UniProtKB/Swiss-Prot annotation:
Acute phase-regulated receptor involved in clearance and endocytosis of hemoglobin/haptoglobin complexes by macrophages and may thereby protect tissues from free hemoglobin-mediated oxidative damage. May play a role in the uptake and recycling of iron, via endocytosis of hemoglobin/haptoglobin and subsequent breakdown of heme. Binds hemoglobin/haptoglobin complexes in a calcium-dependent and pH-dependent manner. Exhibits a higher affinity for complexes of hemoglobin and multimeric haptoglobin of HP*1F phenotype than for complexes of hemoglobin and dimeric haptoglobin of HP*1S phenotype. The SRCR domain 3 mediates calcium-sensitive interaction with hemoglobin/haptoglobin complexes. It is a single-pass type I membrane protein. GO terms for biological process: acute-phase response. The record marks 269-270, 281-282, 333-334, 360-361 as: Cleavage. Intravenous lipopolysaccharide (LPS) produces a rapid rise of sCD163 in plasma of patient as it induces metalloproteinase-mediated shedding from monocytes surface. Long-term LPS infusion finally increases expression of the membrane-bound form on circulating monocytes. This is Scavenger receptor cysteine-rich type 1 protein M130. Interacts with CSNK2B. Residues 1-41 form the signal peptide.
Amino acid sequence: MSKLRMVLLEDSGSADFRRHFVNLSPFTITVVLLLSACFVTSSLGGTDKELRLVDGENKCSGRVEVKVQEEWGTVCNNGWSMEAVSVICNQLGCPTAIKAPGWANSSAGSGRIWMDHVSCRGNESALWDCKHDGWGKHSNCTHQQDAGVTCSDGSNLEMRLTRGGNMCSGRIEIKFQGRWGTVCDDNFNIDHASVICRQLECGSAVSFSGSSNFGEGSGPIWFDDLICNGNESALWNCKHQGWGKHNCDHAEDAGVICSKGADLSLRLVDGVTECSGRLEVRFQGEWGTICDDGWDSYDAAVACKQLGCPTAVTAIGRVNASKGFGHIWLDSVSCQGHEPAIWQCKHHEWGKHYCNHNEDAGVTCSDGSDLELRLRGGGSRCAGTVEVEIQRLLGKVCDRGWGLKEADVVCRQLGCGSALKTSYQVYSKIQATNTWLFLSSCNGNETSLWDCKNWQWGGLTCDHYEEAKITCSAHREPRLVGGDIPCSGRVEVKHGDTWGSICDSDFSLEAASVLCRELQCGTVVSILGGAHFGEGNGQIWAEEFQCEGHESHLSLCPVAPRPEGTCSHSRDVGVVCSRYTEIRLVNGKTPCEGRVELKTLGAWGSLCNSHWDIEDAHVLCQQLKCGVALSTPGGARFGKGNGQIWRHMFHCTGTEQHMGDCPVTALGASLCPSEQVASVICSGNQSQTLSSCNSSSLGPTRPTIPEESAVACIESGQLRLVNGGGRCAGRVEIYHEGSWGTICDDSWDLSDAHVVCRQLGCGEAINATGSAHFGEGTGPIWLDEMKCNGKESRIWQCHSHGWGQQNCRHKEDAGVICSEFMSLRLTSEASREACAGRLEVFYNGAWGTVGKSSMSETTVGVVCRQLGCADKGKINPASLDKAMSIPMWVDNVQCPKGPDTLWQCPSSPWEKRLASPSEETWITCDNKIRLQEGPTSCSGRVEIWHGGSWGTVCDDSWDLDDAQVVCQQLGCGPALKAFKEAEFGQGTGPIWLNEVKCKGNESSLWDCPARRWGHSECGHKEDAAVNCTDISVQKTPQKATTGRSSRQSSFIAVGILGVVLLAIFVALFFLTKKRRQRQRLAVSSRGENLVHQIQYREMNSCLNADDLDLMNSSENSHESADFSAAELISVSKFLPISGMEKEAILSHTEKENGNL
């Protein structure tokens, strides 16, 4: 019974543990085992690993060996593939996979066989990242099955294009192992061609061909079924079946045509201007068209950019010009908008199409300067029929598919708010051409109608009743009612379809000035309140017009709402404008000469000449569209006239656009004799040759009518070019008779431009621009129909129609670009940032790079300042940016301190030459915003670079949203605080911004609403500042990939697995303890019988089969009586039972375990 005693004396806690462990679910046991296996495996896979090739001809070939746990071993070749070879070649820096021999060509390896059934995708960074059976596991491989590879670093490989007429087109041939071979055309596409053209430095791929288009080759066929993504550095880096593996013959040899080897050109035909018309492409010596299938604004933008025209505004599907003929070279063109040439966009193969010439594509290119959008016939600029003028062609918009989204875009573009409705039937019929504009749709959030996609200009008809008409929310049609003379009366404004009056407290002198101008009533004379012109009826508009006075229409003025019911018709406002709106010349031989007559108070009368001078006459001639004043003859030359002689005296300066703009006095003027009436002779339609009044070689040209005040020559002979970015390019302007004016582009050509460039000392003309290429001018259009022979020394020595004689508008202002015109830019294909990139200068009509020899920080500062970027920058190393290759213009630029522009810095002579990217200058200018005098780079006083100097920001309205924009712009973390009152000291210089009101999501501070630049009443004691979170990004250096893995990841994995296993064992321990506690509670709450049963079962569970056999074989049935209570102490230690209970348990046990 000693064995039984051992059972009774055993700690029942360990018995609990064994019982619960045995009763664990299969899932729990599986998890424990898997984690244990992972723990063991990770200790193996996490060690450092290395890769090498052994016994090969060179470092890029041989038997594959892997080092694991400091022991080198081989790889079995079961399932060995080219994908695995590619991974190994890339890993070892031999990127070109040649072949995957089934067994090593060299002698067999020795030691462990570490890997078997290796399965790679080809893009893994290391061989052990591929799937395999497990370290050291293999299918009874021997070292006769050791895997090997043959790679190459590409140095012994060559490629060429043959039979194409040049080195950039032809049949593809590759030299491998000393033999030239071809490429099969199976699955060959534009991606393959792109790799080849880039590899051969032949530009971009234009086309590819198969079926031995360039003749059949000879020798091996090296590649078949290539798979390229288009960005590989060499063709042999694309996926392939292996060198020399194919199922082709030379009838399937592939070829390519690259851009540098193609005879490619693009032109526009049959357009209104040189930048509009049908598109035609020259390919392989023949011109053909482009089908309009899928043609949209992205395609048009690429075409316009390629042609050197402004941004594409219209993408014409069917043009007004005649149909093309010949080839249709391209179809289904699909551009993203950034491609440098139309043939670099996706398209069908050259010559493959499903079109006819009724579907020829075209474009109209424009930067918007020659486009005009307006609403006509609706009573104000914000309502009416939609009219579009594109490059002198006037058209209407067809309302097929026209809705509120399209109308919203028009209203927004015109500054007229949002669309109220899209039809207003009482508009007057404004005549337009039969040219119609069609839009497929707008999404409603475009900034202009030109931004809507899929324009179609012309080619289709639209009925007159289909013309698009809209009314915008800012539509306010003004009128003057109840006045006793023209241009006076009660102010009434029409909103929508309703007329209403304005309260006299809501209409300022500035608003009245705008009203008079819009009604063509000259200037405001007075504002009269208190219903001076009678009380109106109906609506009184509860809004205040907040005009500045320079607006052309009342609808352009901001409006502030006013509470309803605070005004009555007894306070209707009235306005009196200048009365001198009707004026004429009478008794002259032409409409542009004669006696001056005004209509005042409904009656015509002559004007007294007591204060009439040439400046007044200039304004009158311009108002009558008669050019400029040539003379102001006296002595009633054109008759005395009948009726009233008005004694009003005009005080014009000569620069006004309208006689009503000139100050007028009449009070106290003396009576005027009938022979003292004002007269004028305007230049009108007279044709003459004009010269400088100050020229010593040419005296003033005598007029045909010798009057004492005649002017027939330019007063000072001044000439300038405006808005061109330099003194040698821009809009041509001439100073004549006290005002600057422009030249019309009719007949404007290089001969005229040559004279301008020579006169200004700007070399020769390289471009004579028209259509207000440099923006619309103001003032007179002095000259038209210029006919220079190119030898004149002054532009006004050329023949023309004469001063002011023209039929033009400022949309036709002429301009020039001279050879000495220079411009500057930083450009980068990878970024649109204008303040970083390759330094380029424009000279003699072309862009070129700048060499970095002698380039200094001082020179970089000059460049950055000239570009308005910052006051300094840094020189970057040669960029990998794939910027277009262009020649170098200049080198050795050495700027001393002081120059404002790069043009003032000495350098080597201009010399156009080819240069390598390493010789070019790459610059990054500093940020236009900075923080000063703070403890870190992300806190301090806010300063902005603008207008060539650093300045501060006033703290009026400055808050955390403004600070957030600054922090984001500087690359710092979120804003912590927005400081006021010069927290980081007072700055110097201008205070550039005030009343900044950011939302917090703007990309830069100058995108936030604020007062105009430099308009501030603040002092530097109000300088704004910020405190941003200071983000310090520390880059962890990466270990070079040489076949060795990092130990760090292995340690981490082992640690995690250990923690998981520990957690599982702790959970089992607490589970056991908790169950024992429940059992104690159960025993104490039950009766004695239950206690006896539980104890019996617990004892029984601790006895194995041998114990039971021993007890059953006992011959002395009374041995059990020898057990004493003392021998059961170990039981009572775990179950609190009495002595009687112990005896009962013993007796019960004897009865159950044998018939003693």
